């Protein structure tokens, strides 16, 4: 069935496109348990892709959630709107009185005259006006495609403005065309955060201090994660970047362990912080009970404190006991259902684990903007070829900080933890947790998706806003996991309950029986088309 499905997906493509897309579709089998997949390459022109741009990844994903910064988009107003609140990264004023600008959108609103004569003066004025009106902790300036094409020097403008107004002004050359997807923007943001922000704070380090990286507080996820972590006794030093303040990001070097939730968007910072400050990192998963429990136990092993380990087990027992009836109900209602997932660069994997605990079988999974290591595991990184698009992103080199580098976990203990299965500086990728016969599709487009829907008839299909309504017109439940359809949180123990109830309610709604999928309707080929009779 899997091979037939791949053939049917590729059948409609012209030969050149068929050859290109073939490598993006692989099947896990007993003979090839970790097949090489083509990822992080350009989308074929003309294909309806779900990907975003480098600007969206930089401003919209990584930097945008920092709530006391003013984020100025230097470009047309449409780019600003695209990254304004649509992802639902929640935030609230720090301690009830702090700054929170996430309800605002800031743009230089470039017009045709700015493209012809340059937008530098407009950007200077915008920075000064934003400072005088809001007095933020810092300002970010984000370049869009037109800015790169006309050559506005945003780095020089930011440097000059910073001296004039007395606060940090960071410029990000994240023009949309800088990479093949939003992943390029993540990398650009990571580089600047690492070189210009982290390590600039002066707070004292606290006991059991941790950072949560790649968590953006969609629907309040970070708050639920904080509740559990603080209940155990951890100090959540900084979350990058959901509900974050600029100061907390500055003090991210004051931690003993980094937890990486979204591997794709922030693994660069995790690696660089380990090199520069000696802070180890583990891949975590706070989506689904099994993932949460495994993560909490891995954390306790890293700290190796009997009291912390004891408290970890107590909290796990308390939290599971509180939701056990719900878990039993979800399994009763969802056992044997099937799902497909096509989300982001990590979420397909994290949610697959939660679905498995409900008894839901994942048939197809893929990522929008992943790299090969997100599919196959970090062990393949040395074999990944650097192409011309990747070279658009400046590589930075970090070295151990002479004053701040420290050995948090001795090397012999690191090896011991790795042998015990703790994912220190490691991520195994999604493929390893998929069963034989499942299909992986990278950069899935609407055609691929419609074939999957028609042939596999899954009970649910998790995707983004661009795909959601196409799926539901096919009579299949779709939840979009980029912004949670106005719901959430889905992380943490309480998040499992929220997600489970929404799935059960969605699956058993009678609305799906009232929808006729497009492929079951009479063909329109013989009807009136543009230009007259067919």
Swiss-Prot record:
Q: Name one GO molecular function term.
A: nitrogenase activity
* Matching SUPFAM superfamilies: Helical backbone' metal receptor (SSF53807)
Which gene name belongs to this protein?
nifD
Tell me what this protein is called: Nitrogenase molybdenum-iron protein alpha chain
Subunit structure as annotated in this protein's UniProt entry: Tetramer of two alpha and two beta chains. Forms complex with the iron protein (nitrogenase component 2).
Question: Per the UniProt entry, what are the Gene Ontology biological process annotations, in alphabetical order?
Answer: nitrogen fixation
Any single GO CC term annotated in Swiss-Prot or TrEMBL for this entry: molybdenum-iron nitrogenase complex
Q: What class of enzyme is it?
A: oxidoreductase
| Cofactor comment | Binds 1 [8Fe-7S] cluster per heterodimer.
Q: Where does [8Fe-7S] cluster bind?
A: 53, 79, 145
UniProt organism field? Clostridium pasteurianum
Q: What is its EC number?
A: 1.18.6.1
């Amino acid at each position: 069935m899997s091979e037939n499905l791949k053939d049917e997906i590729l059948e409609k493509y012209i030969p050149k496109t068929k050859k290109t897309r073939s490598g993006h579709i692989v099947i896990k089998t007993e003979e090839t348990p970790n097949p090489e997949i083509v990822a992080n390459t350009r989308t074929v022109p003309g294909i309806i892709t779900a990907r975003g741009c480098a600007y969206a990844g930089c401003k919209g994903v990584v930097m945008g959630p920092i709530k006391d910064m003013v984020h100025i988009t230097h470009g047309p107003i449409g780019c600003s709107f695209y990254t304004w609140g649509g992802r639902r990264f929640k935030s609230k004023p720090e301690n009830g009185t702090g700054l929170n600008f996430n309800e605002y959108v800031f743009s230089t609103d470039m017009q045709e005259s700015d493209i012809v004569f340059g937008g530098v003066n407009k950007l200077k004025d915008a920075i000064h006006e934003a400072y005088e009106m809001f007095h933020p902790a810092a300002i970010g300036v984000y370049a869009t495609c037109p800015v790169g094409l006309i050559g506005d020097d945003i780095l020089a403008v930011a440097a000059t403005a910073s001296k004039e107004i007395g606060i940090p002004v960071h410029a990000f050359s994240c023009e949309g065309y800088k990479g093949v997807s939003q992943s390029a923007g993540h990398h650009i943001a990571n580089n600047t955060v690492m070189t210009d922000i982290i390590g600039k704070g002066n707070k004292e380090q606290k006991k059991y201090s941790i950072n949560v990286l790649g968590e953006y507080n969609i629907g309040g996820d970070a708050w639920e994660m904080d509740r559990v972590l603080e209940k155990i006794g951890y100090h959540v030093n900084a979350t990058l970047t959901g509900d974050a303040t600029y100061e907390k990001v500055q003090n991210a070097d004051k931690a003993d362990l980094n937890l990486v939730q979204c591997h794709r968007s922030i693994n660069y910072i995790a690696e660089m912080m380990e090199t520069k400050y000696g802070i180890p990192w583990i891949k975590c998963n706070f989506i689904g009970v099994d993932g949460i429990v495994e993560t909490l136990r891995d954390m306790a092993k890293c700290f190796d404190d009997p009291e912390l380990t004891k408290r970890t087990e107590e909290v796990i027992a308390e939290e599971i006991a509180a939701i056990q009836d719900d878990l039993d109900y979800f399994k009763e209602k969802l056992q044997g259902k099937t799902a497909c997932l096509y989300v982001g660069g990590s979420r397909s994997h994290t949610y697959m684990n939660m679905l498995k605990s409900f008894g839901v079988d994942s048939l197809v999974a893929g990522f929008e903007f992943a790299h090969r290591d997100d599919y196959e595991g970090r062990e393949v990184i040395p074999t990944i070829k650097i192409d011309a698009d990747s070279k658009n992103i400046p590589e930075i080199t970090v070295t151990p900080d002479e004053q701040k580098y420290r050995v948090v976990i001795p090397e012999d203990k690191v090896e011991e933890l790795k042998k015990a299965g703790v994912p220190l500086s490691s991520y195994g990728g999604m493929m390893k947790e998929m069963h034989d016969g499942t299909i992986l599709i990278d950069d899935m487009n609407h055609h691929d998706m419609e074939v999957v829907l028609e042939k596999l008839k899954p009970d649910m299909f998790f995707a983004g806003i661009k795909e959601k309504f196409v799926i539901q017109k096919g009579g299949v439940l779709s939840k979009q996991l980029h912004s949670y359809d106005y719901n959430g949180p889905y992380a943490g123990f309480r998040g499992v309950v929220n997600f489970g109830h929404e799935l059960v309610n969605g699956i058993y709604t009678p609305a799906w029986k009232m929808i006729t999928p497009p492929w079951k309707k009479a063909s329109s080929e013989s009807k009136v088309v543009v230009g007259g009779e067919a």
